Amino acid sequence: MIPFYKLERYEGNEALFELVMMSIVASLVGEPLHIHAEGLRGTGKTTIMRAAKGILPNITRIKGCVYNCDPAAPHCPHHRNMSPNEISNLGTEEIPMPFLEISHSAKVGTVAGSVDLARLTDISHPEAQLLPGLIPQAHRGIIFIDEINRLADTSPEITDILLDVMGNKPGHIQIEEAGLPVVDVTVSVSVWAASNPDEDPGPVEEIRRQLSDRFDMVCYMGRPNSVDILSQMLKENSHQWKAQAKEREAAVEEGKNEVFRSNIVKWAGQYEKADLPDFLRNYIARLYIKHNLESIRAIEAMQSGAILHSIIKGRDKVAINDVTHMIPLVLKHRVDSDTMVRMINDVDSKGVKDGILSFKNRKKNDKEADPDYFPHNATPLKDIRRSDLVNTEKSLTPNEG
């Protein structure tokens, strides 16, 4: 596989590269960011996502823990009730951030967990224990699903598991086996998915709308339209190039990957301290109300996405463009096309900068609260005579009677 740093970047896949980096940064600080890439088959969606496995940073876990327990916050059935001293005695180890895939042939037990047959059939010491599935083993990492629209259509049980995992941050998963107690495990995992909405069974939002809403952001993967880029892609995928690359690029590849890892760790530190200014938060809230959006997940994703986007772009503060850049990514799969067009036209017609800055410069007190607000060309109330202030029926109808 072509290493991540050598993958060709062009306008059509720029958004996916950004979302991949943003999701890794968020995952490293324990905040999953679920992303979905849509596009024509063969445009490189899965290639980019799988290649990102090579740049994932390390995480620290309790030594030998298959649930990837954080030593500072153990969550698995074996370690969550242990004291800090007991955890310290077990020791810790560093491993690459998990990256696991759910295939379309996977069973519920493979994904969630099942009886550990190796221990159950151990002749010397047989015992019944649960073996965590792919999702619990991917805790603090990434789960990737290719052609998720097909999975949503053909595997409703696995889709239900994903809904639980992605419903909250962190999510949870329940492992059930006959004869054993039910185990509920916290899981902090970012779900990455790819699909072609133009092929059967269609877009995810038309198959399981709940699952579609669970994805924080969705981007559409465009085709390359440059002769130079396509020529370079062909070259890097030729047999001769791959054979030569094995010999000359092993050390170079690791060095390049380390640069990505260092940046990710740096960005994660910045993200933990970063926040969105109130005037931008007010703008996002106004979008939710004005355009009658359904899911609060949408504006939560818009907030975290704007912060992450500003960080990977090297900015110290969140810019207005970071927020507007998130609008189509966050709302494409949540609103109909007419609503999306109205929102984009609304932002364009009013002027993004002027519209958002009106919140930044808005005074907290209304003008009416200002004692100088009302004009002073009227007679003060204290100077009006009672006869002028209180009208009787006779004064109002002087010509009657």
Region spans (language model):
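Short amphipathic alpha-helical segments at helix boundaries and their inter-helical linkers
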Residues: 31, 126, 297, 334-342
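Conserved interaction-surface patches within small, structured recognition/assembly domains
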Residues: 2-8, 145-146, 286-293
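Conserved, well-folded catalytic cores of nucleic-acid-processing
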Residues: 19, 23-30, 55-59, 114-121, ...
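Canonical AAA+ ATPase core
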Residues: 35-40, 47, 51-90, 94-99, ...
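Pre-Walker A (pre-P-loop) alpha-helix and adjacent loop at the N terminus of AAA/AAA+ ATPase modules
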Residues: 2-41, 116, 306
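Short, contiguous clusters of charged residues that form electrostatic/catalytic patches at enzyme active sites
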Residues: 18, 22, 129, 282
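Basic, amphipathic alpha-helical bundle interface domains used for macromolecular binding and assembly
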Residues: 14-15, 155-159, 192, 225-337
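C-terminal engagement/docking regions of AAA+ P-loop ATPases
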Residues: 36, 41-47, 286-289, 311-401
